[in-house]
Each structure stands twice: as C-alpha cells, then as structure tokens.
Amino acid sequence: MRHLHHQTSQTKLWAVIPAAGSGSRFSKTELKQYQYIQDATVIEHTVKRLSQLPLTGYVLAIGKQDTFASTLSFQDKHKAHFCNGGVERVHSVLNALNYLSQIADEDDWVLVHDAARPCVTFECLNTLVKNAIETNQSAILAIPVRDTLKQVNQEQQIDKTVSRELLWQAQTPQIAKIGILKKAIETALKNNLTITDEASALESIGESVQVVMGRSDNIKITYPDDLELARLILQSQN
C-alpha cells in the first residue's frame, strides 16, 4: 500500500484526542485513559499509534484538574498541545478545534480519535486518511454489524429483530476538514442535537461521510476487563 508521506506534503494533518471524560464504568479515582498496559498508559499507546502518521501536531483535550497528562512520555512530545476539555466529549472536541483554528488552516484535515482506543492499526489509519484526501470527503473507520440485533421494550422483552444488512458500527478515528467539522458541531449544539460522534454532527449539516473498513480489534476500552483484552491485542499485533 502506498503510504501517505508524499500525499501530505501540502496537506496538513492534525489529531484531536478527547481525554477529559471520567469513564463512568471505571471507579471515580481511575480514569480509563491512564490505566497501564505493560509499561505505558492507554493514552500513550493511543498517541504512539496516531504518531505513525505524518501529523503536524496533536491536541489532547484534558480535564481542568488534570496535572498528570503533561507528565507522560508521549511520542513526538514536541508536537503535543493541550487544551481544556468540556462537559461531554463533543464539547472537548469543539474546544480542541477552537484551539486548532488559531494555529491551523480551516482546510487542514483533523482526525478525532478516542483516547481509549489504543489498538488501531497503521494500515487502518493510513487507508482512512488516504481515502479522505483522495476523495476530498469526510470519513470514519467502521465495521459491518455481525451480530443479530434485537429491539426490546422497557421490560427487556424482544419487540423485533432488526435487519443488520445496512448497519455499520462506527469506530474512530473520524476525519474531516477542521473548518467543516467545527461548523457542524457548533450548528448541532445550537440546535440541541445529540452528538455521539463527529459523523453525527457532519450528517446533521448534510455533509457526506464515507465509511472505511476498520477492524474488530480496534476496541474501545469501556469496562475494566477490556484492559486485559487490549493488552492481548497489542501483544498479538506486535
């Protein structure tokens, strides 16, 4: 596969990592992005993966009281920028985009990636960015839904089986141009829309978003036992 370095000589590529969340399924004292896998935190593994791309820089949106993030040994630490996160993920992303808009061009590309997805592969990252740049279109990593889906009522009884034929499970990174994504999120928030990822904001302003085939091992660490799974995945990938 052709790699990106020659394609991005004019195109600047940035990354945003929202990392202000408390991770409600971990105990209050334990932020999931700061759990250790082997000798590095989850977020250090995540940044290391993203840094395989020719990034101009990356922005970590962290909690206001977070004094830990800046002490970590991030890959290419000279490219690291920090900003305050927000109440929810979408606000953290918008804060990071506002920060970026002071140092980047609105036509630069930005990847938004979950802090707790340390297992994304270079092949997936490379394909995603290449597709976005070549088609000049926003894109996300996603995988087709493979399990049978059930719609249930409030009593946890099955109402019906949902066809999975056209359903894909969204992952991150999700890539768009800085100016377009910023406008999409601002518009969605103004209209009180529920924004669960960047694509949902882009969809709400009629922006086309393509799906790029991801991998099922690009897991998001959500529960404490996901840490062991992530450790095994990282081990097998290396």
From Swiss-Prot:
One Pfam entry name: IspD
Catalysis: reaction(s): 2-C-methyl-D-erythritol 4-phosphate + CTP + H(+) = 4-CDP-2-C-methyl-D-erythritol + diphosphate
Site feature (Transition state stabilizer) residues: R25, K32
InterPro entries (alphabetical): IspD, IspD/TarI, IspD/TarI_cytidylyltransf_bact, ISPD_synthase_CS, Nucleotide-diphossugar_trans
Keyword Amino-acid biosynthesis: no
Pathway as given in its UniProt record: Isoprenoid biosynthesis; isopentenyl diphosphate biosynthesis via DXP pathway; isopentenyl diphosphate from 1-deoxy-D-xylulose 5-phosphate: step 2/6
Keywords: Isoprene biosynthesis, Nucleotidyltransferase, Transferase
A molecular function (GO) term: 2-C-methyl-D-erythritol 4-phosphate cytidylyltransferase activity
The UniProt record lists the keyword Nucleotidyltransferase: yes
Site entry: Positions MEP for the nucleophilic attack: R164, K220
Source species, domain of life: Bacteria
Gene Ontology BP terms: isopentenyl diphosphate biosynthetic process, methylerythritol 4-phosphate pathway
Record EC number: 2.7.7.60
Disulfide cysteine pairs (residue numbers): none
Family of the protein in this entry: Belongs to the IspD/TarI cytidylyltransferase family. IspD subfamily.
Record's function text: Catalyzes the formation of 4-diphosphocytidyl-2-C-methyl-D-erythritol from CTP and 2-C-methyl-D-erythritol 4-phosphate (MEP).
Stored NCBIfam families: ispD
PANTHER family reported in the protein's UniProt record: 2-C-METHYL-D-ERYTHRITOL 4-PHOSPHATE CYTIDYLYLTRANSFERASE, CHLOROPLASTIC
Name listed for the protein in its UniProt record: 2-C-methyl-D-erythritol 4-phosphate cytidylyltransferase
